[in-house]
Amino acid sequence: MKRLFSIWIFTLVGVVQIFAQPFAFDFSYVGYQQSEKEIPGADVVVFVKWKEGDQSARIQKAIDFVSARKMDKKTGLRGAVLLDKGVFELSQPLRIQTSGVVLRGTDRNQTVLYKKGVDRGAVVYLESEKQMQMLGEPMKLSAPWKLGERKVTLPAGCKMGDEILIVRPSTKEWIQKMGCADFGAGKDLGYWGWHPGEIDVRWTRSVVSDGKGGLQLDAPLSMSLGQDDAECFVQRIAGNDWRLKNVGVENLTIDSEYDATNPKDENHAWEGVYINKVKDGWVRMVNFRHLAGSAVVTQRDASRITVEDCISQAPVSEIGGYRRRTFLCMGEQCLFQRCYSEQGMHDFVAGLCAAGPNAFVQCDGYESLGYSGAVGPWCTGLLFDNVNIDGNDIKFCNLGLEGYGIGWNTANSLAYQCTAAGIFADSIPDGSNNHVFACWAQFNGSGDFQQCNNHAKPWSRFASLLEKRLGRDVSAQCRVLERERNNVSNNPTYDVAQKMVEEARKPRITMLMWIADSARFMASVSPVRAMDVDKIKERSKKKADLAHAGKPVFAIKEGKIMVANTLLKGARMNTPWWNGRVRYSAFPKIADAVTRFVPGMEGQGTTTRVDSVVAHLRDKHVVLFNQNYGLWYDRRRDDHERVRRRDGDVWAPFYEQPFARSGQGTAWDGLSKYDLTKLNPWYISRIKELAEKGAKNGLLVINQHYFQHNILEAGAHWVDCPWRPVNNINGTVFPEPVPFAGDKRVWMAEYFYNIDNPVMRQLHKQYIMKMLDAFADEPNVIQSIGEEYTGPYHFTKFWLQTVAEWEAKTGKHVWVALSCNKDVQDAILQEPELRKVVDIIHIEQWYYTQKGLYAPEGGKNLAPRQYQRRLRPGKVTYDDVFKSVSEYRQAYPEKAVIYSGASAPENGKAVMDAGGSCPNVK
C-alpha cells in the first residue's frame, strides 16, 4: 500500500509540474526588436590593424568614418568596424553616437580592448547626443490599464505610429500605502524614505495596430495603472530619432589596467559597455575582465537591448556598495541571456525604477558576494529565468532602509526555475505580488511560492512565452541549456544505478562552458574589401577648435588677476561636499561637482561630466570654482551617527577624498583604510581636467588642501575622516577611542594642527608637496590652505614654508592664496619671507560690517559658523566691502585681493572699485 501511495504522489507531482501555471505575464517583449528578429550581422567597412601604443584615436577615427556613411534603409545599418587580433591599448573611451554602427572583434578572446588610466568611466559608450523632446501637454488616462494588457484605452490625442511616454507618478498617498514614507524613527529620519515624485515609473511605447482596426501598445506594461492613488498620464514624444538604433559591441574582450599591488584598486575602468538613449542595440559574445563596476549597464533611456553570451571575470574593486553590479539594467525591455559573472556584489540586477519587462535568462553567478534581483527601488516586471546564484540570494522584497531607502525593490516579478542560497519574495501592500516557481533555495517571504524544490516544464519560461507569441520555433536563438530530468527514485534498480554511474562520470556542463561551446559568431570577421583605417584622411579641425588650441595666459599684474590682459570678472561657485540622492527627480537640483562619484551613472547630479561642468560654469559666468574634498565619502553618514558601519555597503553619491585607499584593513566605513602618503589619482585627474578645459573660459580653480569641517563640531564629521587613526595605515596621532564631548561633539583641531609631532609633521609635508606636484603645470589653479580654515598661525606658517621649500626644490611657481583669520593673515604678511610666498590675499573669515570689524581670532578651535553664532556680525554694505578690499590693496599693492566674505555676490562692484580681483560683475 505504501508503495502504491508513493507512486500516486510521484505521478501527481509530475502532472502539477506540467500543468501548474506561474505568474501569467508575458515577459517575452524584451531584447533587440523585442526578440522578434535576429541580431543582424553588419558588413565590415573599416579594418583596424593591431599596432603598439595608444589606439584610442585610430579606433575612434574608424567609428567616426562609419558613422558618416549613409544608412542602409532596409537594414538600418551603416557598417562595422573590425578590430584585428591583438591587445589594443586605450587611453580614452570609445564612443558610438550614430545609429547603425557596430564595433566588432576578429576573435572573442584574442581581440582585446585594454583600457589604461585612472578614469572610472566605461570603455565603450553607446549613447545618443540627442535628448527626448515632448509634444503637447500630458494627457490623463480616462480608464484603468490592467497589468500586462496591450489593448488599452488610449487618450484621444494618440495615433498610429506615435511614440509615447507613460508615467505612473509616486504620490504621497501611494507611498504611505506602501509603508515607505520612512523606514524607522518616524518623521525624524524621513529623508531616508520615499518622497513624492522620486519613485515615478515611466515607460516608452509605440502605438501600433491591433490588427482589427484599433490601436494598442507594442509591449505590455509592468504595472496596472489606475486612478485611485495616482493620476497616470501619457505624453507624445517628438520624433523617434532621439535614440540610437542598431548599434552594438561584439566578439571581443574588454579589459582594464589596474594597480597590481592593490587588490582593491578602483582607479581604473568601472564599466565595460555603457548604454544610454539606445533602442534596439546589443552586446554579444564579449568577455569582461578586471572591471570595478558593471560589465554592461543599460540606462533609463535604453530600451530593447540584448546582452547575450557575455562573461565577466576577475573584478577588481573594494567589496562594498555600488561595486560589481555586474549586469545592471536601469532601462526597459532589456534581455540578458546566457551571461556569467564571477565574484559580483550584485551579479544580475535591475536598478532605480527600471520599467519592465526586463529579463535575466540562463544567467549564472559564481562565488557571489551579494544578492541578485533589484538594487533600486520599485523595479517592476523582472523575470529571473534559470538564474543560478552561487552562495547568495535572489531578493524580490522590501529591503527597507538598505541602499538609501530602497524599500520595495520590485513588484510583479517572477523567479522561474532558479537556484540560490535564499530566495526572498513578498506580496506588496498595493495588491501586487512577487512570484517564485519551481526554484531551489531556502525560501522567505509572503509572496506567491509554487512548486518549491521541483523542476518544471517548460524548462525556460522566457523561451516558452516567446515561442507562443511568435508562433515558431525559437530554440536556436534561445539555446536553452536543459538539464536531463530522469526522475530517478531513491530506490533504483541495479541497471538504473549503473546507468547513473556512467552519467556521473561526465562533467556537468556549466553556463561558462555552455557559453564558450555553444555560442557561434556568424557575422563576417574578414577584412577583405574593408577600408584600412590608416588610409582614412584626418578631418580638418574646426576654426572653433583651433581658436582654443592654446592655453590663455593667466597673470597677476599690478595686483590684479588678469587673463589675456583683461581683468577676470565673474561669480564664485563652491563645490558641494555632502548630501545628494540617487533619484531621477533629485538630479536636476544637485549642484555641479567634479569629485562626486555615482558608479554607473553619468550626468547632472551624478558623476557629472567635466565638459558639462565647464559649460554650466561658463553659462553662469563663474570664474572661481572653489574645490574641496567631501565631508565624508558615504551617504550613510548623513545620519550623523558616530557608529562603525557593519560592512562596506556604502551609499552614493560618493564625495571623494584626496587620499588613495590602501586595499588594506577595514576603515570605519567598511572599505579599506586610506594611505595618506598617496593621492587619490581619480580625484586629482578630475580637478586637472576641470582646470584644463575651463582655462579657455578664464576659469580659476581654488584647490583647498584641507577641510576643517572634519575636525570640529559634530562627532560624525570626524569618524570617517582619513586622518583618524582607525581609517589609515600611517599611524596618525589622535586619541582613540574618540573623546566625544557630550558624547557627540568633536574637537580635534589641536591635534590636527600639531606640527611638533614628527609623524604628523611629515605626513602633512608629504601631502602638501604632492598636492603642489599634482597641479604644478596648471596656471589657473590657486593653492589654498583649506576650506573653512580658522587654524592657528603656526600651522599657516608651516604650510607656507612647505610651499616655499617646494618652489625652491622644483624651480616652479604656483599661485598661493592666503585665506585665514585676520590676525593670522596680518601676522603672516608682516613677515617678508612668508609674504613673498603669497600671491593672493583672500578675505573670507573676516570683513567690515555696519557694526564694525568682524574679525574672530584664529586658532581658537571654533568653526566659522560657531564664531558667527557667538559674535553675530552685522549687515555688510558696499562701503564695508570696499573698505575690506581697499585696505589690503593699499597695504600690499603687488598682491591680488579676492573677497569672499559676507554679501560678496551682491557687492562685486565694491570689490572692483576697490581694486580687487574676480569681482562678481559682468
Predicted regions mapped to residue ranges:
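Extracellular "leader-to-stem" segments immediately downstream of a signal peptide or signal-anchor
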Residues: 3, 12, 18-262, 436-539
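C-terminal, active-site-flanking charged/polar segments
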Residues: 379-388, 403-465, 912
